[in-house]
Amino acid sequence: MAPRKDFEDKATVPIQPVPGKRGYEFGGPLGAFVFIFGLSTLIYCLTFLCNDVSGCPVPSLLNPSTLSLDKLKEEAGWPQEGLKAFFDVRVTVWVLSYYVLSLVLYVFLPGEVVEGTELACKGRLRYKFNALPSAILILGGLALGTYMHGADFVVWTFLWDNYVQIITANLIICVVLAIFVYARSFSIPAPGQPNPELRELAPGGHSGNALYDFFIGRELNPRVQLPIPFVDEASRTIDINVWCEMRPGLLGWIILNLSNIARQYRTYGYITNSIVLSTVFQTFYVLDALYMEPAVLTTMDVIMDGFGYMLSFGHLVWVPFIYNIQTRYLAVFPLELRLREILLILAVTGAGYAIFRGANNQKNRFRRDPSDPRMMHIKYIQTSSGSKLMISGWWGLARHINYLGDWLMSWSYSLPTGIAGYTIIESINSSGDMQKQAIQTPEVRGWGMIFTYFFLVYFGALLIHREGRDEEKCKSKYGTDWERYTSIVRSRIIPGIY
C-alpha cells in the first residue's frame, strides 16, 4: 500500500478563483433535452431493431409500405409486458454488485499515485491508478468460470438473456450519479473563499440553465471520500469522472463482447474468426488504455469538462452498449473471413495504433519533461503563456494527429462484420425440432451496416467535434501564438486533407 499523502500543503490553502465561462455547446438547453432523452432511446432502438428474433434490420423496416406498429413490435421481440419488462430488480442488484466489486478493487489493490495537471486555483489533485490489475482480476475470474462451465457459465447466459434490463440498470445508475453530482456542485466555495479540497466549476457548466448544466456538468473533477479509516487518502478518494471513465464501462464493454462469443458458441457449436478478431482488437484497445491510465489526466474530459449527465451516460451506458454492437451482430450471424480480409483489417489497425500511441506518447513525454533525450529532436514554438507547442514529429503532421489514429483503429471493430445484414428463418431440423437460422439475402445485404458501422460514423463525428472544441480553446488560450502555430501546422486531423 502506498504511503499516506495529504492532498495539499497545510500551510497554504488555495483560494477559489473566479471561474471561467464558456458559451453553449451541443445546441444549448434544447440540444441537452434531445441528447438526454434521444440517446437513451437510440440505444434501445438499436438493440431491438437488430436482433435474433427476425433479423438485422427487422424485415418491416425494409418494407415501409406494409409497416405496422404491431408487426414491428413482433419482429423486434418487444416484450408482452411492454416497458415494465425493461426493468428487473434482480438484474439491477447484480449490476450494482459489479460496480461495488470494481470499487472494492480500486480501494484495496495497490496502485500508482499521480498528480494531475494544475488547476485554476493553482493546486493539483492526486489520482490513484490500478484499473489494469483490477481488470485482470475480474477477467481472470471470468476465465476460471468459463473453464469450469464453458459457454454456459452463468455470467455469459445472464448477460445475453437480460441485455435490455442490464441497459436499464446502467441507465438508472448514470442518472442517479448525475443528479448527485449536480446537486453537490452547489456546495463549491464561492470565488475568493478558501478552497482546501480544490473543487472548481467547469468553464462550460455554470450557464445558469439547470437542464443544460445538469447535462454538461457543473463541477470539474467531482470527488467523494469513502469513510474507510484504515486505507490511505488516495485509496479512499474517488474521482467520479476518472473512475467511471476507466472502470465499469470500459471493462463492461469487453465483458459483453465475451458474452457474445459465448452465445455464438452455444448456438452454433463453434466460434468464427470474425468475432474473435473484432473482440481482440477492442480488448487490446481497452487494456492499452488501462495500461496507460495516467494519460487520461491530459484529456479534455478531465481538464475541461464537468461531470454531468453527458459523461455519466457516455461512460456507463453509451460505451458498453454501443461499442459491443459488432460482436452482438456476429454472435447471431457467424461470418468467416478470408485471409486477405484479415490482412486488410490488420494493416488498418496497425497503422492506426502506430499513429495513436506514437503521438500520445510523444505528447505526454514532452509535457512531462521537454529535456527528455527522446524529445531533443522535437521543434516547438514557445508561447507567451509559457507553454510549448510542438511543430515537428507526429504533431508537426497535424494538430490532432492522434484522432486520426484513434479513428483508424475503430475500423477494426466494424470491418469484421463485412457487408452486414441477415434475416432469421425458421425450419424443422432432422430431429423434428424448430430451429432458427440467420441467412443473408440480397434484400438485406448491406442494410445491417447501419448498425455495425454506426460506431464508426459516430466516432468520426465525435472526434471532429472534439477537434473543434480544442481549436476554440487553444485560440482563446494562445491568441496570436496559435495563429503562428496553425500557419506552420496547417492540417487539423488528416495531413494534407483536413
UniProtKB/Swiss-Prot annotation:
One of its GO terms (cellular component) is endoplasmic reticulum membrane. Belongs to the ERG4/ERG24 family. InterPro entries: ERG24_DHCR-like, Sterol_reductase_CS. It comes from Aspergillus fumigatus (strain ATCC MYA-4609 / CBS 101355 / FGSC A1100 / Af293). This is Delta(14)-sterol reductase erg24A. The chain crosses the membrane at residues 30-50, 91-111, 136-156, 163-183, 275-295, 302-322, 339-359, 444-464. Delta(14)-sterol reductase; part of the third module of ergosterol biosynthesis pathway that includes the late steps of the pathway. Catalyzes the reduction of the C14=C15 double bond within 4,4,24-trimethyl ergosta-8,14,24(28)-trienolto produce 4,4-dimethylfecosterol. The third module or late pathway involves the ergosterol synthesis itself through consecutive reactions that mainly occur in the endoplasmic reticulum (ER) membrane. Firstly, the squalene synthase erg9 catalyzes the condensation of 2 farnesyl pyrophosphate moieties to form squalene, which is the precursor of all steroids. It holds the Pfam family ERG4_ERG24. Disruption phenotype: Results in decreased hyphal growth and virulence; as well as to hypersensitivity to azole drugs. Deletion of both erg24A and erg24B affects ergosterol biosynthesis and leads to the accumulation of the intermediate 4,4-dimethylcholesta-8,12,24-trienol.
